[in-house]
Amino acid sequence: HLALLRYAVEDDEHYTHYCARRGLKMEPIMDFEYSLLTNRDGPLARKEIRDLSELDKYMEILHDDFQLPGEEGGDGVRWHVNPERRIHVYERCSQFSILQRLPTAYMWASPMPRRALEQYHLVLKRCPAQRQQMRDVLVYPDKGRLRPEEQAFVDLLHKEAASTVK
């Protein structure tokens, strides 16, 4: 039983206590900031975004996780960008296909393997306007050693995380 948990670093204490109370071990995988993912030949590939309002004229591709779970008060929306210029897509390959074919589109993305960026003709750009630190951790019951196949998966996960474009 393995799970990958992603959260804002600022919420680390909450998740650490949550997992400890439930007898779950947390193993860090990587820390990162979301980056702007866009077509390598599009206008955003050459532009540095210093304020999120600069993205208002571009089309945002959103995955189904654009709201943060458990947000009390506020609207739970991760970042406020023009809601009139959004495409909601629930399948990762379709997102990449849209980004590939629509040079004025972008999405917020976690680190990715270089081979995926090359395959879909995309670029991952750091964005000074979005600096939220995120953390991926592997979570599993703290009941001794992992089975060999679980440990092989964990080792592969660490290897892939280390080789991603951040």
Describe the role of every protein-language-model region:
Residues 1, 65-124:
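Hydrophobic hinge/microswitch elements
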Residues 18-60:
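Flexible hinge/capping segments at coil-to-helix
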Residues 1-2, 36, 55, 138, ...:
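Residue-level signal for nonpolar/aromatic packing positions in well-ordered secondary structure
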Residues 22-31, 109-111, 119-133, 142:
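Short beta-strand->loop
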Residues 6-8, 40, 63-67, 110-111, ...:
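Structural motif
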Residues 6-8, 12, 45-46, 50-81, ...:
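Secondary-structure junction motif
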Residues 7-23:
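Ligand-binding clamshell of periplasmic/extracellular solute-binding protein-like
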Residues 123-165:
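A late-sequence structural motif
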